[in-house]
A protein has these predicted regions:
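Switch/connector loops and helix/strand junctions flanking conserved nucleotide-binding motifs
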Residues: 80, 153-155, 193-197
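Hydrophobic/aromatic beta-strand patches that form the interior of the parallel beta-sheet core
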Residues: 71, 120, 142-144, 185-187, ...
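Accessory nucleic acid-recognition modules appended to NTPase machines
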Residues: 1-140
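Short mixed-charge
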Residues: 165-183
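Conserved nucleotide-binding/hydrolysis micro-motifs of P-loop NTPases
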Residues: 77, 126, 150, 191-193
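Active-site ExK catalytic segment of metal-dependent nucleases
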Residues: 141-151, 159
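Domain-level recognition of nuclease-like catalytic cores that cleave nucleotide substrates
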Residues: 185-210
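Short, surface-exposed loop/helix-turn segments at secondary-structure junctions
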Residues: 87-92, 156-163
Length: 210
């Protein structure tokens, strides 16, 4: 039940208290310490691997969300835990989108590991966010959004541009001296790779390995 509840919250900022509530609704009583012990075991077994928040000084500390994003080491585990089929995911695109995000994060971790890649996410209370912030060991970093369908690309690109503008504004005000993102990228489930006039790269997930 714990694995299934975690899977239902994949790629979200669900609090442990909410996961516990979901578990106890179907499997009797359980405490947070008990839940923690199970989650720690799942981490050690490389079943789950949460993503930490990126908290740059471009907003007040209380504005930026700092909770962990719930992720699996491999999205197929979450799919199996929920008993989902390809046919179901074709009908439930919202759930498919969360699974797709986990898949993208897994691939980015694998392909960037040789460059010391580390992933995090950015999300503030105004609902502005980047699904992934990929930092390399040499200081370069990318702001990334994951969009399963082409209709959502524009929204994702605008989010990335707004975060870049926040970095620029914070630097201009003297509040910080943060490096500007080296890459803005929307990873999609489509087939076309291109660069928009505003500089945002649109990359199909199948192109990442290249």
């Amino acid at each position: 039940m714990i694995l299934r509840s975690y899977a239902r919250n994949i790629s979200t900022l669900a609090k442990k208290s909410n996961i516990l509530k979901d578990v106890t609704a179907n499997a009797g009583s359980m405490t947070i310490p008990t839940l923690d012990s199970y989650l720690n075991a799942l981490e050690k077994l490389f079943v789950i691997e949460d993503v930490e928040a990126w908290c740059p000084a471009i907003r007040s500390a209380t504005t930026i969300r700092s909770g962990k994003k719930r992720e699996f080491t491999d999205p197929s585990i979450a799919v199996a835990a929920m008993g989902l089929t390809p046919e179901y995911l074709e009908q439930d695109l919202k759930t498919f989108g969360f699974i797709f995000e986990c898949l993208c994060i897994r691939d980015l971790k694998v392909y960037s590991s040789a460059l010391g890649g580390k992933v995090s996410y950015y999300h503030d209370r105004s609902d502005l966010g980047a699904d992934c912030v990929l930092h390399l060991s040499d200081g370069r970093y990318a702001l990334i959004e994951f969009k399963l369908g082409s209709c959502e690309i524009e929204e994702g690109a605008q989010h990335l541009l707004q975060i870049k503008q926040l970095v620029q504004a914070a630097n201009a005000s003297g509040k910080t001296n943060l490096r500007e993102p080296d890459l803005l990228m929307v990873i999609t489930g489509g087939e076309l790779a291109y660069t928009r006039p505003d500089g945002v790269k649109i990359i199909p997930i199948g192109c990442l390995r290249d």
